[in-house]
């Protein structure tokens, strides 16, 4: 008879323990009910990137002196710089500049070490394409500035979301 009583007591303790665990989980669920949602509806709402965000690289052709510092500091030797030596003025003239963003790791070394500041990081992060060859940007594509998310009236930025007072 005693083993049956102890089994019944163990069953009762396990039931109370299970009810307590369920109650703790339910309390956590209720505590999150008053918070703002974390998920955003991406195509229609976009996050505003931080000031130091490493997006697509912007290139200013007129400032470049073809010193190739960007190629030397790049861990994967990515920027392709074509230049021609002008012998009468003893300076390099830049012919072509291109970066393949399919290979780029967005480390920012080229931007940091550029002596003339002809390279800068933009806030553009939508670089997806159907063909990987479209990710190879030449100096014309690198020279285009992206449209700012803040200026785009068709997209509601995350700062305009209503706040829930708790």
Curated annotation (Swiss-Prot):
GO terms for molecular function: 4 iron, 4 sulfur cluster binding; iron ion binding; NADH dehydrogenase (ubiquinone) activity; quinone binding. Its cofactor is [4Fe-4S] cluster. Residues 55-84, 95-124 form the 4Fe-4S ferredoxin-type domain. It catalyses: a plastoquinone + NADH + (n+1) H(+)(in) = a plastoquinol + NAD(+) + n H(+)(out); a plastoquinone + NADPH + (n+1) H(+)(in) = a plastoquinol + NADP(+) + n H(+)(out). One of its GO terms (biological process) is photosynthesis, light reaction. It is a peripheral membrane protein. InterPro entries: 4Fe4S_Fe-S-bd (IPR017896), 4Fe4S_Fe_S_CS (IPR017900), NADH_quinone_OxRdtase_chainI (IPR010226), NDHI (IPR004497). Keywords: 4Fe-4S, Chloroplast, Iron, Iron-sulfur, Membrane, Metal-binding, NAD, NADP, Plastid, Plastoquinone, Quinone, Repeat, Thylakoid, Translocase. It is an enzyme of class 7 (translocase). Signal peptide: none annotated. Pfam families: Fer4 (PF00037). Gene3D superfamilies: 3.30.70.3270. Binds 2 [4Fe-4S] clusters per subunit. PANTHER family: NAD(P)H-QUINONE OXIDOREDUCTASE SUBUNIT I, CHLOROPLASTIC (PTHR47275:SF1). Belongs to the complex I 23 kDa subunit family. This is NAD(P)H-quinone oxidoreductase subunit I, chloroplastic. It comes from Tridax balbisioides (Coatbuttons). The gene is ndhI.
